[in-house]
């Protein structure tokens, strides 16, 4: 299975920043890549909040896969925050 080299928290924070800044996401900047690079860290707490909410899968998610694996994966990200 392919994995990302960018941590999940950073990827989520970048999406949140892009949604605010990018014309594609509802912002006003048609070329927001540099601004996202400069501001994604402002969204890290929101990214952790999203992951915290997702730590328990919903019924459809649980039916599609292994709940213990899901909890372990999300938990690994959240534990890094505590250890930071």
Regions found by a protein language model. Name each.
Residues 2-35, 49-70, 81-84:
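Amphipathic alpha-helical oligomerization segments
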